[in-house]
Swiss-Prot record:
GO terms for molecular function: calmodulin binding; SH3 domain binding. PROSITE patterns: ENKURIN. Its main location: cytoplasm. This is Enkurin. Microtubule inner protein component of sperm flagellar doublet microtubules. Binds calmodulin via its IQ domain. Interacts with TRPC1, TRPC2, TRPC5, but not TRPC3. Interacts with CFAP45. Residues 163-255 form the Enkurin domain. Residues 163-258 are annotated as: Interaction with TRPC proteins. The IQ motif is involved in calmodulin binding.
Length: 259
């Protein structure tokens, strides 16, 4: 087989040289990285002998052949019926005749008439007719009669709601009292002259101590810790001077009561 080079000239003596064509090697086969995991899961959740049955099945013996009536259901043995309840008295015989000739002095006509006269007349059930053909319906359950608005407790607030409103009102009063008590405890308290003077002297004493420590610093501040210490002392002195100025300027001072 002669291979033609498409990039070179169309005709060349070198094109007549036969070339050995080799089949390129196949790429490696794809193997999933989850193959072992899937295999383990299949072994874990697989039910044994579910599709093909057990590996070895015991062959029935020729001696245990199917016998006649062996598949029929065997009924339980019969039990004797026993009646434990008390029996009724026997029916009278044909030869037994009732006692005849017994008379009563009760006047059933007058008794029935008196019962009718003294009895309460039955009231007809109220009905209504909604069609000309005479279709009757119960009037009480129809909703046409004002039944509930005529009740004694109609429009009256139920007892449980009144009780609940009282509980809510009581809880609100307790909450308001609690808030007022906290506000009273956290009210502003006036600082007395003795306490103001004691606080002022304490601040001045602290300022003197910080100022003395500031004067003890070295002349040359050539390190970061020294600079930080100097800045800290300057801030403390500045804050103390501000507090002293406030106390000296204002004679009446109120503070928050934290008790």
């Amino acid at each position: 087989m002669v291979a033609m080079d498409p990039t070179g000239p169309s005709e060349s003596i070198y094109n007549l040289i036969p070339s050995d064509w080799k089949e390129p090697p196949q790429p490696p086969r794809y193997v999933s990285i989850f193959k072992a995991t899937v295999k383990d899961d299949m072994q874990k959740f697989k039910t044994a002998m579910k599709t093909m049955g057990p590996a070895k099945l015991e062959v029935p013996s020729p001696k245990d052949f199917l016998k006649k009536h062996s598949k029929e259901k065997i009924l339980p043995p019969k039990k004797k019926f026993e009646w434990n309840e008390r029996r009724k008295p026997p029916v009278p015989l044909r030869t037994d005749h009732p006692v005849m000739g017994i008379q009563s002095e009760k006047n059933f006509i007058n008794t029935n008439a008196a019962d009718v006269i003294m009895g309460v007349a039955k009231k007809p059930k109220p009905i209504y007719v909604d069609k000309r053909t005479g279709d009757k319906h119960d009037l009480e359950t129809s909703g046409l009669v004002p039944k509930y608005i005529n009740k004694k407790d109609y429009g009256v607030t139920p007892e449980y709601i009144c009780k609940r409103n009282e509980e809510v009102k009581k809880a609100q009063e307790e909450y308001d009292n609690y808030i007022q008590e906290n506000l009273r405890k956290a009210a502003m308290k006036r600082l007395s002259d003795e306490e103001r003077e004691a606080v002022l002297q304490g601040l001045k004493k602290n300022w003197e101590e910080v100022h003395k420590e500031f004067q003890s610093l070295s002349v040359f501040i050539d390190s970061i810790p020294k600079k930080i210490r100097k800045q800290k002392l300057e801030e403390e002195m500045k804050q103390l001077e501000h507090d002293i100025g406030v106390l000296e300027k204002h004679k009446v001072i109120y503070i928050a009561n934290k008790k």
